[in-house]
Curated annotation (Swiss-Prot):
Entry GO MF terms: urease activity
Disulfide bonds: none
Family in the record: Belongs to the urease beta subunit family.
Cited SUPFAM superfamilies: Urease, beta-subunit
Keywords associated with the record: Cytoplasm, Hydrolase
Pathway(s) annotated for this protein in UniProt: Nitrogen metabolism; urea degradation; CO(2) and NH(3) from urea (urease route): step 1/1
Domain of life: Bacteria
Gene behind the chain: ureB
Protein name: Urease subunit beta
Subcellular location: Cytoplasm
Keyword Cytoplasm annotated: yes
GO-annotated cellular components: urease complex
Amino acid sequence: MIPGEVQTAGGDIELNAGRRTLSISVANTGDRPIQVGSHFHFFETNGALSFDRDKTRGMRLNIPAGNAVRFEPGQSRTVELVEYAGRRHVYGFNGKIMGAL
């Protein structure tokens, strides 16, 4: 083994296996691009993003950690969300939850 080397199992690694997902259409109604990171609580995203927020409570983008999705002004796109796991407590972001989901 080389110091710092990462050894992984062979084959594909399935992200978020067994978790509930949701595909939802999102439109940027603002005049500036909006970027949402992989672990941001989607329910609390920028108010210029138009979508059914109630359906997204407790969910985040179903993309690899560290990635993001960018919504250009006037753009609509469908994204896939995945439920948070673990204790399901959300703190920070825009302060709309600040506790258990």
